[in-house]
């Protein structure tokens, strides 16, 4: 099968005349690969910074006023108390789960910070934090830490389906998501 060319006969003859006496160069040099920017480092650094920023809000010194009677619950002052009722009834189903079993208090704070950052980044409104029973250290501290974070709108003891009194359902304030504009 012949190759189709768009050059005229005169142009082809001129090209052959100009290329007469040339020879193919032997490739004996090293091929340089283009330098690639390490993409994976930037997000990892950003994630670590988000975790540190989010866990910065958690203090062991501050004791917010939480209801000590009945199930553990909290609603930020600017949020409707109906949201806690929805959490209690299980109207919200969590999309992310965090299991704090076996973690130290420092690790638990970091993981809580990472969870809140992930919820905001992924536009997840509801998450479940399983603190367990254990020695009651994390069970007591987790609500105190969550009440201090400005992006936590409300939390309530989880329904039995999600862990009962060994877990909390948390409502996270997320930025309004807008779809990208089409050109």
Curated annotation (Swiss-Prot):
InterPro entries xrefs: Smr_dom (IPR002625), Smr_dom_sf (IPR036063), SmrB-like (IPR022990)
Domain Smr: 98-173
Nuclease is among the record's keywords: yes
EC number assigned by the record: 3.1.-.-
GO molecular function: RNA endonuclease activity; rRNA binding
Domain of life: Bacteria
Short name of any one Pfam family annotated for the protein: Smr
Uppermost EC category: hydrolase
PROSITE patterns in alphabetical order: SMR
Record flagged with keyword Hydrolase: yes
GO biological process, one term: rescue of stalled ribosome
Record-linked SUPFAM superfamilies: SMR domain-like (SSF160443)
Annotated keywords: Endonuclease, Hydrolase, Nuclease, RNA-binding, rRNA-binding
Binding partners and assembly: Associates with collided ribosomes, but not with correctly translating polysomes.
Function: Acts as a ribosome collision sensor. Detects stalled/collided disomes (pairs of ribosomes where the leading ribosome is stalled and a second ribosome has collided with it) and endonucleolytically cleaves mRNA at the 5' boundary of the stalled ribosome. Stalled/collided disomes form a new interface (primarily via the 30S subunits) that binds SmrB. Cleaved mRNA becomes available for tmRNA ligation, leading to ribosomal subunit dissociation and rescue of stalled ribosomes.
Protein family (similarity comment): Belongs to the SmrB family.
Protein name, UniProt field: Ribosome rescue factor SmrB
Organism: Escherichia coli O7:K1 (strain IAI39 / ExPEC)
Gene symbol of the encoding locus: smrB
